[in-house]
Amino acid sequence: EMDPPISHYVLIYKKTGEKLGMITYSDFNPRNYSAVIGFYFPEEHRHKGYGSILMALFLRTVFHPDYRPYFHKLWAETGAFNTASIHLMERFGFHRDGTIRDHYWLDGEIYDQYIYTLLRKEYLENNQKCHIELCSELNQVPRFGLS
């Protein structure tokens, strides 16, 4: 089975077409049905709730029974300094599986790197309902899709 290309999911403001942020998955492992995710939001769109909206839509999409490739697990890494990313992943049930000590240099400082995972069964058992409610509460559901 071939490794699928990196897939980008983008949150776009309907009225202007402006890209508010994105989540990607890459390094799909067909033996373990896992992939690494990463997310990015331009500075002007941070701390406005767009990360939660995009993560909810992304997880609902990739853990849907009909979605291919099938994912058993998603995982991510982030620096210990990145409290916004840590908060976002923990809010959506990602588990901190490990720490790589003194791994990430930023502005002359060394930080630990955290590894987070979310299993399909954890999402389906614990998070699916609240994520769907978050999405349905939006007055204007942003356009979301593969780019």
List each language-model region with its residue ranges:
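Active-site rim helix/loop that mediates acceptor-substrate recognition in acyltransferases
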Residues: 1-6
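Acyl-donor (CoA/ACP) binding surface of acyl/acetyltransferases
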Residues: 8, 12-147
